[in-house]
Amino acid sequence: MSEHSPQGTGANVPASDSPLADALWAALGTVEDPELRRPITELGMVERAQAVSEEDGGYVADVKILLTIEGCPLKTTIEQDVRKAASTVEGITRVQVEVGAMNADQRNALKSQLKPERINPFTAPGALTRVFAVVSGKGGVGKSSMTANLAAAFASRGLAVGIIDADVHGFSIPGLMGIREAPTRLDDLIIPPAVDAPREHGQVRGGAPGGFVKVISIGMFLKGNQPVAWRGPMLHRALEQFILDVHFGALDILLLDLPPGTGDIAISMSQLLPNADLVLVSTPQHAAV
């Protein structure tokens, strides 16, 4: 029997003396967490990976993965991806996967790995993310549709894109992007849901692989048609949390879908993200400009 048994989240696992175990670990390294978009081997999600010999001369891949939270909605997807990856290893004739969940210490280690400090990653020294605020003078001119289409276009070119739906009182981005699931919460760290770049006939439009869009919206935290009656400081704190406590990871582009006009939200965003470029959406009507 040969195995890799990493200790701790994000551990660098030394090469074993078994080529089969190394090949199994390398195969599992091609599996990414669908939300974090990083290999599960880097995130400490593989507790056990071993190749066990069988009587017929083949080997069974015995793998245990740890989900970030109990009841993770992506359990089936991750398990299927692990099975598929392990089955590609030459010499592996059967795959068995055990699924567990991280304990508190493992989650804390993961949080420290993902976001060691509560800082604004988009204004920090060396930040490379290009930030665009999509704005309009009035509602109903297609601002949110423009935001969603820009995100899809950027992602189709292989870029990592984030959207903050800052239109708190008229959020629509989750629906436009086809996102129904809620964000994953690691205590006070929020992991936004992600969608892959648009595809046509199985191919990413534009031919560039790897693009995706991560979305956060107040609508993901509300039940049904629950209204939002926030103003001033409450709005600022909510938007600040979207920037400081949401782990987008390394983004090429961040899009802000702002509400129409120049109210509290626009003022807060200009303070939180002063480096944002503006994309003004309008129609030919005088009232829109």
Give the location of each predicted region.
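N-proximal, solvent-exposed amphipathic alpha-helical segments enriched in charged/polar residues
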Residues: 2-47
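Gly/Ala-rich phosphate-binding loop of Rossmann-like dinucleotide-binding domains
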Residues: 87, 151, 155, 270
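Extreme N-terminal, non-catalytic leader segments
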Residues: 42-45, 50-55, 61, 68, ...
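Residue-level signature of catalytic and energy-coupling elements of molecular machines
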Residues: 28, 46, 72, 86, ...
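Phosphate-binding loop that captures ATP/GTP phosphates
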Residues: 154-230, 236-237, 243
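Walker A/P-loop phosphate-binding motif and the immediately C-terminal alpha-helix
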Residues: 130-169
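Conserved catalytic-core segment of NTP-binding enzymes
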Residues: 107, 245-248, 252-289
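Short, hydrophobic beta-strand segments
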Residues: 2-10, 59-69, 132-134, 277-281
